[in-house]
Amino acid sequence: MSTTAITILGTGVWGSALGTLAQANHHTVTAWSRRGPLTLTQSLAQAQVLVVAISMKGIPDLAAQLQQLKLPTSTIIVSATKGLDPATLRTPSQIWQATFPNNPVLVLSGPNLSKEIEQRLPAATVVAGPNQAAVETVQQLFSSDCFRVYTNPDQLGTELGGTLKNVIAISVGVCEGLKLGTNARAALITRALPEMIRVGTHLGGQAETFFGLSGLGDLLATCTSPLSRNYQVGYQLAQGKSLPEILDQLHGTAEGVNTTNVLVDLANREGIPIPIARQVHRLLKGRITPQEALESLMDRELKPEACDLL
């Protein structure tokens, strides 16, 4: 494989893990951060592939800055951010595609806990987008004996799976923090999947994508690991800590907190049923206790399971 020049925007644990994978495949990696020594212009000088691994809140400003630099249309943009923009309700890749309409824009998402990837533990992910040549290029860049990369044309579904599961991870953290048991956790995760699918398909994603790595896979990883920041938010809320206290002590961004707010706004506008996410939202706003959130879900109207699985 020929050497590819890759620029990674964001030097947090996720950006660093992706950089390590690319370097292990003998590609040239340049890392940029807001506080780093390189300017954006310097970091992008040779970039053939641009990987964006910053938090959602920084995406709009960064996109505006990059737009001034006039990227070559051959540069592949890979979004590795999970979230929704509160101002526009758009996903990260939608922002990038609107900013660079002539560039291939892809999404990389899956059950990828950064610390495990840094330790070279086996993992798999999905790179998604409509440009098959670009997708296969990025697949080759990161694939290795410890990191298996699959492709998918459903860019939006892949992206939404990784975004929406962060909200559910908060709820599962609450479940674990309250010591509700394995049965409760299994029920919560299982009922969360159709909730994610309802939102995802309403917005244009394909239902089957949510049964893959970027949907169910990421949901399982994030909802069952204390390494997940979103899980930790829910767990510590159940332990009686306040949200500001939790976020202040958290190492990194829990995207699920912002995503919950945006998701509820979106669901209200579009009339999408999201009972689990709605209780997470009420909890994050301090309107109910973790125990009250549980009671609200358990006391809902009884119904057949099949009526809303998809």
Swiss-Prot record:
Its main location: cytoplasm. It holds the Pfam family NAD_Gly3P_dh_C. Gene3D superfamilies: N-(1-d-carboxylethyl)-l-norvaline Dehydrogenase, domain 2, NAD(P)-binding Rossmann-like Domain. It is found in: Cytoplasm. The keyword Nucleotide-binding applies. It comes from the Bacteria. Sn-glycerol 3-phosphate binds at residues 82, 110, 165, 218, 228-230. NADPH binds at residues 14, 34-35, 82, 114, 229, 255. GO terms for biological process: carbohydrate metabolic process; glycerol-3-phosphate biosynthetic process; glycerol-3-phosphate catabolic process; glycerophospholipid metabolic process; phospholipid biosynthetic process. Its EC number is 1.1.1.94. Keywords: Cytoplasm, Lipid biosynthesis, Lipid metabolism, NAD, NADP, Nucleotide-binding, Oxidoreductase, Phospholipid biosynthesis, Phospholipid metabolism. One of its GO terms (molecular function) is glycerol-3-phosphate dehydrogenase [NAD(P)+] activity. Pathway: Membrane lipid metabolism; glycerophospholipid metabolism. The active site is at residue 165. The keyword Transcription does not apply. It is an enzyme of class 1 (oxidoreductase). Catalyzes the reduction of the glycolytic intermediate dihydroxyacetone phosphate (DHAP) to sn-glycerol 3-phosphate (G3P), the key precursor for phospholipid synthesis. Belongs to the NAD-dependent glycerol-3-phosphate dehydrogenase family. This is Glycerol-3-phosphate dehydrogenase [NAD(P)+]. It comes from Acaryochloris marina (strain MBIC 11017). The gene is gpsA.
